[in-house]
């Protein structure tokens, strides 16, 4: 499968040449494939935020290259703005970046900067607002009059409105209650299924990653530590613990059962999958 984004021996050093020099990413290489739902996870300081800021050209590599559709994004610095239209980045707590008088103006900011017609801008604004579960009633409201969860949705809609080929979200559920978290994740699943765009979810929550990502990349110390399907990654529970990460609670239970001789897959990562295996062992009969 051809990657839509390729990271080739990426290195990034902050404050290079000063006493405060720090390498955040060290010779990192990875691929992101067209149409996949990718999860990126890592402990604080693993290089997650630095990596994703390179993917749409917000940071320039100290060394190495970033390819988008086979083209080095920094081959012509004058075109880096076009890269940012194709690779949309939603920062953590994106609602803090809302600034316009109305929701309509805020969501239309990106498409307007793309030089689109008013008709196309209007189409994109309404489609994106609907995609995040809001209706036209909010369009003329001040974004600052909305609830916290609604503000987050509007901020995400503003990036979706550019219709990027790749949508990257940094901790999109941070600070939300469980219902709010699931609402955001559900809209991302729906967006991915309907648009066929590549979605990259950066999270500290193993449960979020396990239940949504088709593939996972684990970062540690500024480089790729593990990658694979959720089952492949969570099979390495002990290795994950050594880099300060945990596995989903259901995987912990499966590991404990497996160690006690119960023939279940220790890498199972959803409640439904573990329940199915346990019911099969009981001959399909549910037990209270």
Where do the protein language model's features map onto the residues?
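Catalytic Walker B motif of ABC-type/P-loop ATPase nucleotide-binding domains
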Residues: 167-170
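Conserved catalytic motifs of ABC-family nucleotide-binding domains
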Residues: 163
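A short, flexible loop at the N-terminus of ABC-type nucleotide-binding domains that lies
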Residues: 1-4, 13-27, 77-79
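ABC ATPase NBD Q-loop/coupling interface
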Residues: 65-82
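Helix-to-loop junction immediately C-terminal to a conserved catalytic motif
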Residues: 56
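Conserved ABC ATPase signature
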Residues: 142-146, 150
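Conserved ABC ATPase "signature" region
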Residues: 119-137
């Amino acid at each position: 499968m051809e990657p839509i984004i390729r990271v080739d021996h990426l290195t990034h050093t902050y404050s290079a040449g000063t006493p405060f020099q720090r390498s955040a990413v060290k010779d990192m290489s990875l691929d992101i494939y067209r149409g996949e739902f990718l999860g990126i996870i890592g402990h604080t300081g693993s290089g997650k935020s630095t990596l994703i800021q390179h993917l749409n050209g917000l940071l320039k590599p100290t060394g190495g290259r970033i390819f988008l559709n086979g083209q080095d994004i920094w081959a012509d610095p004058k075109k880096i703005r076009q890269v940012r239209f194709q690779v949309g980045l939603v920062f953590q707590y994106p609602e803090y970046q809302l600034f316009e008088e109305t929701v309509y103006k805020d969501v239309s900011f990106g498409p307007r900067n793309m030089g689109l017609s008013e008709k196309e801008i209007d189409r994109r604004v309404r489609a994106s607002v609907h995609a995040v579960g809001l209706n036209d009633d909010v369009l003329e409201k001040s974004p600052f009059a909305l609830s916290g969860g609604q503000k987050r949705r509007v901020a995400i809609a503003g990036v979706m409105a550019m219709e990027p080929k790749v949508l990257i979200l940094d901790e999109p559920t941070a600070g939300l209650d469980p219902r709010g978290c699931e609402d955001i994740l559900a809209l991302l699943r729906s967006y991915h299924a309907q648009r066929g765009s590549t979605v990259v979810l950066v999270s500290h929550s193993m449960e979020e990653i396990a239940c949504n990502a088709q593939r996972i990349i684990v970062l540690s110390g500024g480089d790729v530590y593990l990658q694979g399907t959720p089952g492949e990654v969570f099979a390495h529970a002990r290795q994950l613990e050594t880099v300060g990460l945990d596995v989903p609670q259901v995987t912990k239970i499966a590991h404990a059962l497996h160690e006690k001789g119960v023939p279940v897959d220790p890498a199972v990562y959803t409640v439904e999958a573990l329940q199915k295996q346990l019911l099969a062992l009981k001959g399909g009969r549910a037990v209270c």
